[in-house]
A protein has these predicted regions:
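Short alpha-helical transmembrane segments in multi-pass integral membrane proteins
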Residues: 1-27, 84-151, 193-249, 305-370, ...
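N-terminal transmembrane alpha-helices
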Residues: 14-46, 50-51, 67-79, 83, ...
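Transmembrane helical elements of multi-pass membrane transporters/channels
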Residues: 25-44, 145, 179, 208-212, ...
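Helix-terminus/linker motif at the lipid-water interface of multi-pass membrane proteins
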Residues: 35, 39-57, 126-133, 189-196, ...
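Interfacial/gating helices of multi-pass transporter permease domains
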Residues: 47-67, 134-138, 198-201, 240-247, ...
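Small-residue-rich hydrophobic transmembrane alpha-helices
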Residues: 56-116, 153-172, 279-343, 374-396
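Short runs within selected transmembrane alpha-helices of multi-pass transporters and secretion channels
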Residues: 77, 146-164, 172-180, 201-214, ...
Length: 453
């Protein structure tokens, strides 16, 4: 029977609607949001790439900074979001407001600490993230406005996740899409019209994120949400902070390893000059676009898997996982084939430099081959996360950019030189796939047996 936090209508929708229609309808807003985010990341790469190879390399350096902000923001957002969702299910609005307030204001405070520390040590910070001496001025100019905006960016991630956990994903999408579109508009204006260079790209990102923050905050101030933000509701109990951290640890680990992996990639690439840093940065941004589609489809699976697993409709969980892998594979195949056929054109689009092309093209084609494995990797991880198998989910989440990637990026460049850097991510993806399959297949068989029992 449905629990008291779900209406009968929602129960029938989640347990009776045909799986393909249900998953695609739930995935559509997430795919749109993630595509917009990927597009404005590509826009940054495109516009900055018109300046110089060193400026293009700065995008990769600042990507690691953005990953740090996201790791902390997702930790507080996902950490509090699950608690808020369960509290509202128990009709405990006071607890929801307490955890919403605590996560929001704590994220803002942590963002302020990051901003002050980062600005005070900016050149050393950028070198730590993998900058070269020639990239450093561009990376510093790019990062400075983003660091100023870090408190708002981090708390925006908290608000975005609270809205999703309250079931108001469309409100979250409005803030995200508005910020993304504004970023695309402001980039050429600040970079070329106002001649601000990479600093203009950073300012465009910072301003668009501030607007997104205001839109998201307005949802809470206008009473569109159940949970509210009140300074007086910030908890003083260490146990509550530990609960937020424990719930948010998988997200923190995943995003944190993305940052560390990106930093190590930049450090390895800088031994071969600015063109290598720029080339690997361009590849990362292009394939993040393709990966965002697989992740978006996978996020359509999460509520379906969680609901039906809780309702003991295990065969629907199995059907949902298989369909999601198939749907994500179809989307990835189309995008991958288009990218493979236009590989040189795409790289030239972001930086028309023969040295950049020489580095990026082999890496591009290696990554194309490995992208076909992503649907299995993404769906396996998300399915386990959604049904509460947090140990397996955390292990798999840490594989791609952590357990598999970090040892490779520390060893292959010494053994193979530049080709070792170009091969690291595809090999890490292949290893993650090999690790994921033994988790996925037995569990799908187990779901059938559980249904029959």
């Amino acid at each position: 029977m449905p629990t008291n936090d779900l209406s009968q209508q929602q129960y029938h929708k989640m347990t009776e609607t045909p799986i393909p229609r249900l998953i695609l309808s739930l995935a559509a807003p997430t795919i749109l949001s993630m595509l917009i985010t990927s597009i404005y990341n590509l826009a940054d790469t495109f516009f900055v790439g018109q300046l110089s190879t060193s400026a293009s390399g700065a995008v990769g350096i600042v990507s690691s900074l953005m990953a740090i902000i996201q790791a902390l923001g997702f930790m507080f957002g996902h950490g509090a979001g699950g608690i808020i969702s369960r509290s509202l299910g128990n009709q405990d609005t006071h607890a929801a407001t307490k955890f919403a307030s605590t996560s929001f204001f704590t994220a803002m405070a942590v963002g302020a600490v990051l901003a002050v520390g980062g600005l005070a040590t900016l050149p050393r910070f950028m070198m730590l993230l993998g900058s070269t001496d020639t990239i450093l001025p561009h990376a510093s100019a790019y990062a400075r406005p983003i660091l100023f905006a870090a408190p708002l960016m981090m708390s925006s991630l908290v608000m975005n996740n609270i809205l999703r956990y309250e079931g108001k994903a469309s409100f979250a999408m409005i803030g995200l899409v508005t910020g993304g579109v504004l970023n695309i508009v402001l980039d050429p204006l600040f970079i070329f019209v106002f001649k601000m260079g990479t600093g203009g790209a950073g300012l465009a990102t910072a301003l668009s994120q501030c607007i997104s923050f205001c839109i998201l905050l307005s949802m809470f101030l206008r009473g569109k949400t159940v949970s509210q933000f009140r300074i007086t509701e910030i908890t003083r109990a260490p146990r509550d902070y530990l609960l937020i951290f424990t719930n948010g640890a998988p997200s923190f680990g995943r995003q944190g390893l993305n940052s560390i992996g990106g930093m190590l990639l930049n450090i390895a690439a800088r031994e071969y000059g600015d063109a290598a840093v720029a080339g690997m940065s361009i590849i990362s941004r292009i394939f993040l676009f393709i990966l965002s589609v697989a992740i978006g489809v996978g996020q359509g699976l999460q509520p379906v898997a969680a609901f039906n697993y809780g309702a003991k409709k295990y065969r629907r969980v199995r059907q949902a996982a298989i369909f999601t892998i198939f749907a994500a594979f179809c989307f990835v195949c189309v995008l991958n084939v288009v990218c493979w056929c236009n590989s040189e054109t795409l790289i030239h689009l972001f930086r028309d430099d023969p040295e950049v092309l020489a580095v990026a093209l082999p890496a591009f084609r290696y990554q194309c081959l490995a992208m076909f494995l992503q649907p299995v990797i993404v769906v396996t991880n998300m399915m386990f996360q959604s049904i509460g198998k947090s140990g397996r989910a955390t292990l798999l989440a840490c594989c791609r950019q952590g357990i598999c990637f970090i040892p490779l990026i520390l060893t292959l460049p010494h053994l193979l030189g530049l080709p070792g850097i170009e091969m690291c991510q595809p090999i890490a993806d292949t290893l993650t796939f090999v690790i994921s399959v033994p988790f996925l297949l037995p569990f799908l068989h187990k779901l059938n047996r559980m249904e029959e029992a």
